[in-house]
């Protein structure tokens, strides 16, 4: 839209055009009062994206303030591109998770691909080299053609971008549930490594210093992407394909290498990715954080389309772009580095001392706004919150153990449920070995990468069981953090910190805001108990389709430190004769379980209980046993319960089986989802030492070499007798089989 066609100040107000950009009447009146005049079209657009939920967290700030964000090893908490945690030896790990839900529902390949690209830029803009990508994906039931299409395209988009840029995708999770039918979730996490002296911040310091634009040219793609991500899906959403950006991983690879070289040059003052809200957010946020202002001449912005207006340039979310602040007079040093990588680097403005964002276009001042008003002074809403009617009903509903006539058949069916089934079809499309640092590939409890030149390694995971959160968001929030930590510990690592992605429905509905509040309470309590501070994250609200919300899905990304690569542990049984232990007692808890969903087609009842002090004690005892060389394998018990965890531990073991005798109330208890449990194997000579070290561990059987999975009760009655290769075939074949089948 050219300047000549843009609505006047008066039209914007009288025709309430600001509402189309996502601003309310009250917000527009507040803008008028802050700047002392009516904003023009460009300024209205700038305020609308900066004050969107996606950029300002205006609905979620009161909830986010509950999270513990400080810790002994935290070098950078929330507020920058990514969080940073010290791991010793002058090194730190940098990580962050972000959502690209709305774009992925409309244009799944590009939506997922650019989600990966954006989170990688967040990490390298801190000065870190990205070493791994993970993801957390949610889709509807894998029986409808639409869901199959979204699933295949999202995975292809993640693979296409990650593989081209040369960063391994080492882990993640994929869940399928009716609640995501119209609104899939695509959360991407990136982990990077950095030396302390290389840490950079997104700040525009030093009056007179040069503001430099680097990377791809600006086009019209992604305009109002941040606003689009702050509203519910409707039939009109399909028309917003232009709000989905297009990614170029080869450009990103060049940008990554060039930026990491530039970061070593002391001419660089500040650097930030142009992510949500593009040029607008990067310039306003960098200036606001530094207590300065920025003036830019938009005629100098590299453009790939003709006749772009100031509004379009400032709101574009074209990918692979960075904004830098360079020491005045040293611009050529930086330009030379980017030219070496065949990248455009252009001086487009300078830092000022008046705390204003001033934009010139075609000889006119087209924007003059206070940066703090944009970046810090969005209204904060304390939304009404009310407990949904179903919650009390669930608390008071007794869930009986499902009647099971054939436990072997039930186990096989559970292994074929898409949420439990092997995700090999997914991760086989990812290059998870590129750069050759991957020690534990996708498919175990966590991805593990060694840190070259040291004995250390990093374990990483994403976790969330949204069914528990639907039943009880506070308990479910605790479980999400605890399960992530369990996965880290099972890999031989000490949990360090959390990055969270809060995916919820429309916060303007009191029962949805209640879910957000309660889950944050649960997450906060678990993070405090387990000493895993929240160092950053993302909020994605308005995940609704035709008025129906997704299950509350606060995904927990967690990273842990393996002190010695000799401690790295996987879920797979290692050798015949090893003794199998289960840590933790099993209760009859079926609400929200995979078994309940499979047998009854719905979930209801009281969520499984969790005692965080017990959880911590078991995790610490298991980690100490691993570090003391007592453990052969370790696997957390999650979806599908003990039966599934034990069976999974036999898969991929080249002929091993298991002979289990266990004291449980019923066959159904094999599939109960009681929390804080682990399946562990130890060598026979370590049996007594392990039992003494881990108080809640009970011996339940032996690893065999006959390739048979056998489970008996205490009386010796056989519940399951099945060939491991048959179970594994069912588990591995489930997703490919569903994708091929006609709905």
UniProtKB/Swiss-Prot annotation:
Gene Ontology BP annotations: 'de novo' IMP biosynthetic process
Keywords for the protein's UniProt record, in alphabetical order: ATP-binding, Cytoplasm, Ligase, Magnesium, Metal-binding, Nucleotide-binding, Purine biosynthesis
Main subcellular location of this protein, as a coarse class: cytoplasm
Domain of life: Bacteria
Location relative to the cell: Cytoplasm
Xref: CDD domains: PurL_repeat1, PurL_repeat2
Subunit-structure text: Monomer. Part of the FGAM synthase complex composed of 1 PurL, 1 PurQ and 2 PurS subunits.
Function: Part of the phosphoribosylformylglycinamidine synthase complex involved in the purines biosynthetic pathway. Catalyzes the ATP-dependent conversion of formylglycinamide ribonucleotide (FGAR) and glutamine to yield formylglycinamidine ribonucleotide (FGAM) and glutamate. The FGAM synthase complex is composed of three subunits. PurQ produces an ammonia molecule by converting glutamine to glutamate. PurL transfers the ammonia molecule to FGAR to form FGAM in an ATP-dependent manner.
Protein name (database record): Phosphoribosylformylglycinamidine synthase subunit PurL
Protein source organism: Bacillus pumilus (strain SAFR-032)
Gene: purL
């Amino acid at each position: 839209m050219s300047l000549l066609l843009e609505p006047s100040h008066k039209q914007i107000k009288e025709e309430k055009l600001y509402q189309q950009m996502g601003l309310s009447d009250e917000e527009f009146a507040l803008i008028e009062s802050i700047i002392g005049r009516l904003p023009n079209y460009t300024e209205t657009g700038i305020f609308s994206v900066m004050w969107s939920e996606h950029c300002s967290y205006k609905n979620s700030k009161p909830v986010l303030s509950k999270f513990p964000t400080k810790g002994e090893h935290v070098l950078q908490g929330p507020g920058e591109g990514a969080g940073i945690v010290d791991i010793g030896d002058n090194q730190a790990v940098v990580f962050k998770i972000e959502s690209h839900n709305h774009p992925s529902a409309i244009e799944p390949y590009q939506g997922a691909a650019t989600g990966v690209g954006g989170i990688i830029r967040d990490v390298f803009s801190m000065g870190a080299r990205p070493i791994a990508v993970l993801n957390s994906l949610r889709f509807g039931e894998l029986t409808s053609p639409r869901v199959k299409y979204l699933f295949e395209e999202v995975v292809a988009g993640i693979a296409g971008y990650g593989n081209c840029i040369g960063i391994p995708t080492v882990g993640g999770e994929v869940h399928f549930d009716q609640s995501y039918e119209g609104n899939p979730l695509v959360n991407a996490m990136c982990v990077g490594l950095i030396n302390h002296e290389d840490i950079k911040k997104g700040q525009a310091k030093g009056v007179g210093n040069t503001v430099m634009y680097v990377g791809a040219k600006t086009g019209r793609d992604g305009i109002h992407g941040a606003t689009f991500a702050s509203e519910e899906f409707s039939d009109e959403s399909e028309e917003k394909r232009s709000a989905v950006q297009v990614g170029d991983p080869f450009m990103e690879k060049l940008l990554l290498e060039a930026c990491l070289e530039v970061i070593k040059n002391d001419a660089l003052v500040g650097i930030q990715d142009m992510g949500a809200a593009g040029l607008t957010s990067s310039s306003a946020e960098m200036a606001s954080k530094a207590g300065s202002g920025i003036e830019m001449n938009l005629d100098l912005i590299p453009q790939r389309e003709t006749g772009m207006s100031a509004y379009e340039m400032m709101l574009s979310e074209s990918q692979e772009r960075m904004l830098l602040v360079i020491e005045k007079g040293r611009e050529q040093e930086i330009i030379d580095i980017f030219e070496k990588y065949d990248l455009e680097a252009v001086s487009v403005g300078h830092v000022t001392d008046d705390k204003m964002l001033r934009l010139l276009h075609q000889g006119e001042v087209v924007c003059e706004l206070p940066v703090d008003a944009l970046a810090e002074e969005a209204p904060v809403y304390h939304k009404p919150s009310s407990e949904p009617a179903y919650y009390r009903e669930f608390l008071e509903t007794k869930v009986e153990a499902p009647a099971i006539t054939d436990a072997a058949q039930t186990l096989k069916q559970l292994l074929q449920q898409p949420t439990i089934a092997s995700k090999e079809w997914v991760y086989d499309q990812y290059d998870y070995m590129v750069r050759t640092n991957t020690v534990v590939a996708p498919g175990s409890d966590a991805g593990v990468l060694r840190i070259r030149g040291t004995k250390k390694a990093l374990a990483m995971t994403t976790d969330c069981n949204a069914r528990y959160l639907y039943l009880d968001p506070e308990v479910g929030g605790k479980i999400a953090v605890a399960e992530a930590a369990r996965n880290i510990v099972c890999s031989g690592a000490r949990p360090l910190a959390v990055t969270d992605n809060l995916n919820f429905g429309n916060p303007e509905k009191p029962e949805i805001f209640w879910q957000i509040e309660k889950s944050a309470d649960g997450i906060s309590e678990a993070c405090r108990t387990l000493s895993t501070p929240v160092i950053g994250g993302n909020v994605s609200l308005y995940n609704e389709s035709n008025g129906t919300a997704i299950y509350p899905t606060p995904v927990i990304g967690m990273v842990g430190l393996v002190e010695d690569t000799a401690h790295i542990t996987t879920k797979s049984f290692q050798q015949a004769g090893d003794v199998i232990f289960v840590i933790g007692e099993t209760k009859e808890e079926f609400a929200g379980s995979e078994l309940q969903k499979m047998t009854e087609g719905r979930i209801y009842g009281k969520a499984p209980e969790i005692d965080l002090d017990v959880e911590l004690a078991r995790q610490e005892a298991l980690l100490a046993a691993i570090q003391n060389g007592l453990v052969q394998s370790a696997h957390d018990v999650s979806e599908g319960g003990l039966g599934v965890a034990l069976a999974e531990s036999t898969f991929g073991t080249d002929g091993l089986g298991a002979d289990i005798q266990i004291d449980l109330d019923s066959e159904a208890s094999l599939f109960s989802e009681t929390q804080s449990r682990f399946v562990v194997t130890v060598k026979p000579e370590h049996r007594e030492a392990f039992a003494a070290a881990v108080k809640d561990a009970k011996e339940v059987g032996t690893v065999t070499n006959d390739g048979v999975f056998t489970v008996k009760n205490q009386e010796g009655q056989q519940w399951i007798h099945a060939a491991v290769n048959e179970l594994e075939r069912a588990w591995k074949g489930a997703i490919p089989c569903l994708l091929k089948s006609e709905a």
